[in-house]
Amino acid sequence: MWKEKKEARSSRKFIFLREERYQLQGLRNENYIEAHLKVSCLIGESDQVRYMVEMPVYKQTNEDGMYKWVGDLHELRERIVFSLNENGQIGVIHNISEIQLKWDEIKSKVFLRHKNEKYRNMLIKGIEKVLSNNDQLAGALRFAMPYLLLSPGIHSREYKKNEPVSGYR
């Protein structure tokens, strides 16, 4: 049995700030992100460890194109409970059913908000595909900010000179 949120072993609060600027030929983009995070360590039976990341605040300045989708889908990332894999990265999402229920709640609102977008059906099918499989959801979050900074998997041990590393690139 897992201990309740109030019985977490430890928790820390972070503010994630990110400034993105891209320019590719004539295309230019700027985006500023602010996210408030609370990361808790939960201890269960047999001293199994799970981490809970709560992100109650997520603000971004750019709401054009795909950035609008990121803001609309933030509710799905408000509370994520996961354990780490053998590489120290996000391994298993333990509250995937809760995330799927949230998606069912907001799906119609997202569909209506993006009704004039050409690729809306393809994006919604992609979201449903990722949410239907724990491995795909964990893989999607594993290299997404700010989760990459919380559990990068490369800082937990030393690597030998020629040892291959499975990381972001």
Name each model feature, range by range.
Residues 1-169:
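Signature of exported/secreted
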